[in-house]
């Protein structure tokens, strides 16, 4: 999704509170509730009656399940002929059931989200004084930044080593040895030439792949993914067209996030499909890191990322809290 200054082609109104946007190549469905324009490769669908948001979610979820995946081919000719299964009551579509079903799923997901935020420590979005101080150094005018933070230049190869993780079996079969869905069997994330989704497209069996944790993933090949960099704090394996590097010093998640972002900023514009981001090249590149008394300031890196995490997660925590309180209120009233 992008933005433009031109007048919207489709306008949300009381008569049409939602449009459904169908991705012709991807089979994806999105629901638009604000004015928008379109470019290409999408179909704009106007509901024939005023469905609620939950009813639309139910309908398009059922609809997508019936559309055969033809890869990058166009799908609308197939999608418009699909017959879908919907709940009925007394011979009519049971919209009340659909609404209740989606509402129940929402409440379940909110509870799971709340539990995850609590367990991971992300439910606390209040900044400590040290975190505020770290952010303040970046809130100052651009010309003062170098005065507030001391930076040093470091060679990537002096800070990291490349890991040579392998597939353990003698032969590899893509159809049976990996899965696009994470399951109890296929539970190890595998890096490859993936743009987005933290560089993960496939999962493998733990016993089939050599793995490492607290590493950084660098994509060395790919039309748009070359030189994409992703932190991989969890146990991870290597599939193809990417490699893992590991710091030569102990790090935690926050420091790993800082380092991966810094590397990406340094190399992303230098490499591409015609100039692969192999380790022999990348290790010679330099990155800028905060320093204190002539040494890398890991404490500042950790504080800054921790503060940014809290700022990013704040709205999610407040949203979850609001939904949980609303659910408790409904249960109490009923």
Regions from the language model: what does each represent?
Residues 1-83, 157-286:
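DNA target-recognition domains and sequence-specific DNA-contacting regions of bacterial/archaeal
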């Amino acid at each position: 999704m992008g933005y433009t200054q031109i007048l919207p082609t489709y306008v949300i109104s009381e008569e049409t509170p939602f449009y459904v946007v169908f991705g012709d190549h991807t089979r994806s469905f999105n629901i638009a509730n604000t004015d928008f324009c379109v470019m290409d490769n999408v179909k704009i669908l106007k509901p024939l009656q005023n469905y609620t948001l939950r009813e639309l979610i139910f309908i398009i979820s059922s609809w997508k399940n019936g559309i055969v995946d033809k890869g990058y081919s166009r799908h609308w000719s197939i999608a418009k002929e699909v017959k879908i299964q919907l709940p009925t009551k007394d011979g009519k579509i049971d919209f009340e059931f659909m609404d209740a079903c989606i509402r129940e799923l929402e409440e379940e997901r909110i509870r799971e989200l709340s539990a995850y935020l609590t367990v991971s420590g992300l439910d606390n979005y209040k900044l400590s004084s040290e975190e505020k101080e770290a952010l303040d150094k970046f809130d100052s005018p651009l010309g003062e930044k170098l005065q507030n933070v001391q930076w040093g230049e470091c060679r990537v190869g002096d800070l990291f080593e490349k890991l040579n993780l392998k597939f353990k079996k003698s032969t590899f079969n893509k159809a049976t040895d990996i899965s696009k869905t994470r399951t109890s069997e296929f539970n190890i994330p595998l890096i490859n030439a993936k743009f987005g989704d933290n560089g993960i497209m496939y999962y493998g069996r733990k016993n089939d792949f050599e793995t490492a944790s607290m590493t950084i993933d660098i994509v060395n090949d790919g039309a748009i993914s070359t030189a994409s960099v992703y932190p991989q704090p969890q146990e991870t394996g290597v599939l193809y067209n990417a490699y893992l590097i590991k710091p030569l010093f102990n790090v935690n998640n926050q420091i790993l996030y800082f380092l991966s972002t810094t590397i990406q900023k340094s190399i992303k514009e230098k490499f591409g499909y015609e100039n692969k981001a192999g380790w022999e090249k990348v290790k010679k590149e330099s990155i800028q890191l905060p320093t204190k008394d002539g040494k890398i300031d890991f404490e500042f890196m950790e504080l800054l990322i921790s503060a940014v995490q809290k700022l990013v997660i704040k709205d999610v925590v407040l949203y979850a809290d609001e939904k949980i309180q609303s659910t408790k209120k409904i249960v109490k009233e009923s």
